[in-house]
């Protein structure tokens, strides 16, 4: 059963009851997932940007957008318009497929993994998680990478509070660490 189907058939009715909501449309849901990678070295090394674009496209299965510097910062040796990172926004079927792969395949492959921090919510039910290395994703093989780079994964939900967002992600299988 896919994550989307499981959400519709079991998670949604359970959250409706647990959060004591009156309408099925009030139940929190995942709206989008953004995968972002900031590359400071992209200003000097164009190959690192190309490698990152290829890796993110392989991991997410979607075209990557290059993020550029909004203004020049002499201390970082960047000019306005220089590429400094890349990002992908996932919605719909690809979003659910990515979330399922993240929870079931990627997170358990992290070394010394005891669960993700429950403190990484932003106050509005959205969850951000930093990944230190791209090798946790099964699509990336060790031979093909030039350097170990991390990424930020933000899960945007329609939850109004952190508690609602956490209960949604917990029901979906996100392994939160118990502090």
From Swiss-Prot:
GO terms for biological process, alphabetical: translation
Subunit text: Part of the 50S ribosomal subunit; part of the 5S rRNA/L5/L18/L25 subcomplex. Contacts the 5S rRNA and the P site tRNA. Forms a bridge to the 30S subunit in the 70S ribosome.
This protein's record includes keyword Ribosomal protein: yes
Annotated gene: rplE
Protein family: Belongs to the universal ribosomal protein uL5 family.
Organism of derivation: Prochlorococcus marinus (strain MIT 9313)
Function, in words: This is one of the proteins that bind and probably mediate the attachment of the 5S RNA into the large ribosomal subunit, where it forms part of the central protuberance. In the 70S ribosome it contacts protein S13 of the 30S subunit (bridge B1b), connecting the 2 subunits; this bridge is implicated in subunit movement. Contacts the P site tRNA; the 5S rRNA and some of its associated proteins might help stabilize positioning of ribosome-bound tRNAs.
Gene3D superfamilies: 3.30.1440.10
Keyword Ribosomal protein: yes
Name used for this protein in its record: Large ribosomal subunit protein uL5
NCBIfam families: PRK00010.1 (NF000585)
Stretch forming the signal peptide: none
One GO term describing the cellular component: ribosome
């Amino acid at each position: 059963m896919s994550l989307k189907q499981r959400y519709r058939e079991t998670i949604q009715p359970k959250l409706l009851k647990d959060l004591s909501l009156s309408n099925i449309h009030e139940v929190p849901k995942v709206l989008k997932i953004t995968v972002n990678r900031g590359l400071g070295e992209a200003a000097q090394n164009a190959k690192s940007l190309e490698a990152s674009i290829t890796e993110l496209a392989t991991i997410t299965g979607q075209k990557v957008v290059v993020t550029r510097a909004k203004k020049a910062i002499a201390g970082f040796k960047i000019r306005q318009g220089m590429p400094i990172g890349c990002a992908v926004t996932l919605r719909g079927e690809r979003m659910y497929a990515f979330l399922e792969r993240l929870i079931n395949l990627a997170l358990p492959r992290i070394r010394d993994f005891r669960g993700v921090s429950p403190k990484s919510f932003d106050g509005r039910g959205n969850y951000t998680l930093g990944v230190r290395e791209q090798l946790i994703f099964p699509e990336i093989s060790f031979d093909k990478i030039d350097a170990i780079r991390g990424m930020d994964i933000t899960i945007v939900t329609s939850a109004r509070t952190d508690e609602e967002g956490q209960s949604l992600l917990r029901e979906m299988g996100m392994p939160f660490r118990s502090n």
